């Protein structure tokens, strides 16, 4: 259904921010059927619980140039897309056995250096998007904070430190327009309500959590809807951000406008 709806709504690019397949190559292969420029960072569930790293490597090979990790892509000379640490599970800094098997024992400091090295290639007069699976630390420690731990006490900031440090360093030399991520589900555990999914910092950087879970739902008539986060840039500036529910015909049936 996702492929069909994307062909109807026709975004300029599609960003996948992880937890796509639980390591299933069959699902990952479907991304290559999308005839829209796509960029993919894998999430902690995509590691496949395979400490050899083979499952992760297979996904990386299938995705080819669509795969993003610690690097910068410049799309159509229109936008910079900087990618974060792959397969992050949040909680400060943690490198899983699967990621170590593929990339080696990368320290938090090394991860920051990789971000900053890649960011040097950005085109200054173009917008910069930082895409990650888990968001950065420093955005709140309440259970409903945009990256707040909600599933058990003590509640705390569950964002990635290396990402936060890199953002702070890059902001010294240029604006980061958007940091987009997922991982932390919108619906909180223990019936605590819903998470804050949007934030703007003092530097004007927008933080968007796209983890609307589940992404599919039906209405009282049995009609199926699917969720996408939608961002529009006009003249190199963000003009619109929303969480949208689309029908199978590509119509917007529900929309939560965030900006």
Task: List where the protein language model places each region.
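Binuclear metal-dependent phosphoesterase catalytic core
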Residues: 72-75, 169, 175, 186-259
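Beta-strand-turn-beta hairpins that frame and shape the catalytic cleft
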Residues: 69-91, 123-129, 199-206, 236-240
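Active-site neighborhood of phospho(di)ester-bond hydrolases with catalytic His/Asp-centered motifs
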Residues: 14-19, 38-45, 129-132, 158, ...
